[in-house]
Amino acid sequence: MSSIRVGIVGASGYSGEELIRLLVRHPGVDLRWITSRQYKDRTLQSVYPGIGRFGELEFDDLESLEKKENQLELVFLALPHGAGMDYAHFFYNRGKVVIDLSADFRLENPLDYELYYKLSHPHADLLKKAVYALPEIYPDQIAHSNLLAMPGCYPTAVLLSLAPFLKKGWIDPHSIEIVALSGSTGAGKTLDTKLLFSELADNLRPYSFPSHRHIPEMEQQIAKLVKTDSVKVIFLPILAPLRRGILLTVIGSLSQPISQAEAEEQAQEFYKEAPFVKILPGGIMPELRYVLYSNNLYFSIHVLEEKKKLLILAAIDNLGKGAAGQAIQVMNIRLGWAQTLGLIP
């Protein structure tokens, strides 16, 4: 098969590292450019021994941007929120496919971005051109866009868990409550006392409640799924003593009586062509070990008929389906390749 020339901007963060791990085994990728100020001029194999393909490729810095852009067809941006906006604008305006793993182009309203991320968006005109790149929900839009905004890790799990039932009108979209346990890599490579081993071990720490940054993203997309102006969700994230992985519970009020069998059948039908979404049957519940180092999402459905509630348990790897793995799935869709290429051995 023909290959595409790829660059990674921000290749030394956790998402960037995961992108490298996955892309070196992707048969359609010719990795041409990786950036990291920390590792500048070092080879890929000197930083990640045993990496295999592209081991002699050297980390570069962004000062070489103008020289390198002609060598690239597709660019992953794996920078912290706010740091990659100008690079997205630069590459997009030069006809490159841009896949941005940050939150910079997820929110349609620049005022929401300013409120939750404390930054004024310098390229707000691009927000209308960006596609929210959740593969199982928006594959057609992904296939025709050059600016692809990757969903956050929590919203990925929440939206994929709820979508089959929201689209049917079975859940009141204003009743949704979420509690999630997450590993520490979700915070990035931040120098923060709260992320030290001795602070994480033997501990669970709720954080960013009640106004986590992923809330407007969830609310925006839930409103789109049910075709209403706005919804409000309650979201409690909890930092767990784990490197990676998310296990979450979603609860919503049923808007009509449904059976357990109907709920499972609806989910199976909704995701019948989704290779990475796995619905667990018969009361089996997801565990983190099912999803680590994969692009899979596992979830179980529990209809609480007497309480008129639907409870969903879901598990993903925040660096896999929550970040780098899903970004490669999106690349595959955009290029007309099988979604699973490079993601399933």
Swiss-Prot record:
The name this protein goes by in its record: N-acetyl-gamma-glutamyl-phosphate reductase
Catalytic activity, EC: 1.2.1.38
Upper taxonomic lineage: Bacteria, Pseudomonadati, Verrucomicrobiota, Methylacidiphilae, Methylacidiphilales
Pathway membership: Amino-acid biosynthesis; L-arginine biosynthesis; N(2)-acetyl-L-ornithine from L-glutamate: step 3/4
Active site: 153
Coiled-coil portions: none
A Pfam family of this chain: Semialdhyde_dh
PROSITE patterns, sorted: ARGC
